């Protein structure tokens, strides 16, 4: 399930809640937004490689299980099948229902079932650094704050021949 595939799910939730829908051109007022980058919440490939070896944090991969388990090809050509050694799989689609995060009890149960310790540091990853943010949002909802993003994600790791991959082929 990609972010694009999830749009109908979110739209179904919007319609279910009877929120307004319209068609036509959209004109938005101009506005200002000052973005700030916090480098401490983004991990680089070398950081993730060290964590994979030393187990100082948990790597949580948000991709669907068939991709994580090397049972399905990646949507991006040239990427290996599999996952970062030691990573845990929490597919982002399991965390939402009809476009909304599941309840905190459901979220907690999902992370627990997948072996994620909510009291240890977590690095979230996925295919391209986008859907990992759903994992980060779910963790924030549970009050988990020691969470970072590996935005290079599988599109970076899976393209390299010099990095370990599980399951080993």
Regions from the PLM with identified roles:
Residues 1-5:
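Single conserved hydrophobic/aromatic residue that forms the stacking wall/gate
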Residues 6-58, 62-169:
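Rhodanese-like catalytic fold shared by cysteine-dependent sulfurtransferases
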């Amino acid at each position: 399930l990609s972010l694009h595939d999830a749009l109908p799910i979110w739209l179904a939730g919007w319609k279910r809640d009877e929120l307004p829908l319209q068609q036509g051109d959209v004109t938005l007022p101009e506005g200002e937004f000052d973005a700030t980058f916090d480098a401490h919440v983004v991990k680089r490939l070398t950081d993730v490689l060290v964590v994979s070896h030393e187990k100082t944090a948990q790597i949580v991969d948000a991709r669907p299980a068939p991709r994580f388990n090397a049972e399905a090809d990646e949507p991006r050509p040239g990427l290996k099948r599999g996952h970062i050694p030691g990573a845990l799989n929490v597919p982002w689609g399991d965390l939402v229902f009809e476009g909304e995060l599941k309840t905190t009890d459901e979220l907690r149960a999902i992370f627990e079932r997948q072996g994620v310790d909510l009291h240890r540091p977590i690095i979230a990853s996925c295919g391209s650094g986008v859907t990992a943010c759903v994992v980060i949002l779910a963790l924030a909802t549970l009050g988990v704050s020691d969470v970072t993003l590996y935005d290079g994600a599988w599109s970076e790791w899976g393209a390299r021949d010099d990095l370990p991959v599980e399951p080993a082929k």
